[in-house]
Amino acid sequence: MCLIIVSGTSIPILLAQVTPAAKPAVTAPAAPVNVTPATALLSTQKLAIAGLSHDHVHNILGDYRDGKVIIVGIAEADKQLRDRYQKQYNLPDSILFDDLKKMIAAKKPEVVLGYNPVAKHIDIVEACAPLGISVMVEKPLAATLAQASRMEFLALKYYIKLLTNYETTWYPSYQHVYDVAAKDSLGQIRKIVVHDGHQGPKEIGCSKDFTNWLTDPELNGAGALNDFGCYGANLMTWLMNGQKPIAVTAIARHFKRQTYPKVEDDASIFVEYPTATGIIEASWNWPFSIKDLEVFGDEGYMHALDKDNVVTRINNNPAVTRIATPLTAPNDNPVSYLQLVTRNRLKGITDRSSLKYNMIVMQILDAAKRSIAEGKRIVL
């Protein structure tokens, strides 16, 4: 995990914008600016943002501009970056800070959302956990398993919620596949195949502030392996009900050395379970943007083609394509979900955003890196 908060590295797109009939006057610097909070807020929590270098921040700032969320503070050390976003989203001076700790002390947010380099997620938790402030970061949870373990320790010690956001968590098609599989309509799951990625972060126009760290092995933890491999690891953990794999084998390719000299741009990860096999294909070399999910059982097959469309085939019956039923709050967006979890109205312990599941994700990614480095199957 990771706000829509869209995870992956797609071109920033502002989603679910609302055009009101009239714009009421701003009543407070940090309040949403053009929709009545009583009818439009996705969350009543006082949210804060740590970092602006992740392009997915456009989604939460779009929600702020449209009056759907309350942002009380934004911490970003880069003044040029702060100024750019301030101008684009008409952000008041009163919510902008150059330091996370100063912002927390001044604004006392309920939750901090991380839009900084993955390797810096740990800094947010170090600052927030002792103060009892919950955190949600963009996927993956951390750059390394060691960082994730430290973050887990802090979250458990100080009783905060530490969540990871993935774009695919809010896909109706994926939830439909999960629901059908959970009813044993496909029989025993035997194979899970996940494709994630696009033509490459630079190729699709991600900002330089984003790609500077996304293509750095220290700041991102890897290249395409971390960026898109985490999706498959997360979905497999969810579909396998939190079961840890028994072994991981991976290979990495470097097709675009001139464009991405420091990191791999393609990875294939094979995840072994006692009764099933998972195949993760993560790449910055697809001919188009892709996020899909295939599940094969003893008695049936389902393929979530994209966010909405699902193909189902049971035994030898003809395949049927349908549009998945739209999700409803809090399962349709990360902000509403976040509020219910942090206020203990939704457990959030065994789902795709949970700390428990994302520690397993980090174990899979760590094993994949070791497999690549050592050229062998890694037994967990």
Predicted regions, residues:
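Beta-loop-alpha module in the N-terminal Rossmann-like domain of NAD(P)-dependent dehydrogenases
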Residues: 89-154
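Bacterial N-terminal signal peptides
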Residues: 1-13
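Rossmann-fold dehydrogenase core element
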Residues: 150-168, 190
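Predominantly a Rossmann-like dinucleotide-binding segment in NAD(P)-dependent oxidoreductases
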Residues: 169-259, 375
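C-terminal helix-rich "cap/oligomerization" subdomain common to oxidoreductases
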Residues: 18-41, 111-113, 341-380
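N-terminal Rossmann-like dinucleotide-binding module
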Residues: 20-89
